[in-house]
Amino acid sequence: MASHHQLLCLNILGFRKPGISTEDYRNYMVNVHAPLVAGLMEKYGFLHFTMSHASEQSPQLMDQLYDAQFANTASYDCCVQIVFPSIECFVNMKADPYFKQTVGPDHEKFADTKRSQMMIGWFSPLLINGQQTDSLSAAE
């Protein structure tokens, strides 16, 4: 059983809805969807919420990193990372009427929810603002 100090991290490996450009997808997620959900995340005790989006430049950037270990580029359009202290935070947020009526249905406007994948696990911050962290303190 996990200690109460461990943080959970949900990674959503997302695909955009067909017909939406990468630029429009990122703009919608950052400027429309994120503001809808961020207040609920605060209300239910979430700690971090970040997004990274692939762009038109992503293939050329990956080419610069390519070698035997960096050969398999993922086809996802984004990665959303959400950190929270307990699964109840997420369960309670999803049960909130505002989530059910507004946030949940909003996903269908921009995301290919049938293809997107998720992974949950323990959050281990190892480098923050260019400084190494005590990785053991995050896992105690």
From Swiss-Prot:
Domain of life: Eukaryota
Catalytic activity of the protein: naphtopyrone YWA1 = norrubrofusarin + H2O + H(+)
Domain EthD: 18-113
Pathway connected to this protein: Secondary metabolite biosynthesis
Assigned keywords, A-Z: Monooxygenase, Oxidoreductase
Pfam families: EthD (PF07110)
Record GO terms (molecular function): monooxygenase activity
EC number: 1.-.-.-
Disulfide bonds: none
EC main group: oxidoreductase
InterPro entries: Dimeric_a/b-barrel (IPR011008), EthD_dom (IPR009799)
Family, as annotated: Belongs to the tpcK family.
Function text: Dehydratase; part of the gene cluster that mediates the biosynthesis of ustilaginoidins, dimeric gamma-naphthopyrones isolated from different fungal species. The first step in the biosynthesis of ustilaginoidins is the production of gamma-naphthopyrone precursor YWA1 by the non-reducing polyketide synthase ustP, via condensation of one acetyl-CoA starter unit with 6 malonyl-CoA units. YWA1 is then probably substrate of the ustZ to yield norrubrofusarin via a dehydration reaction.
Name of protein: Dehydratase ustZ
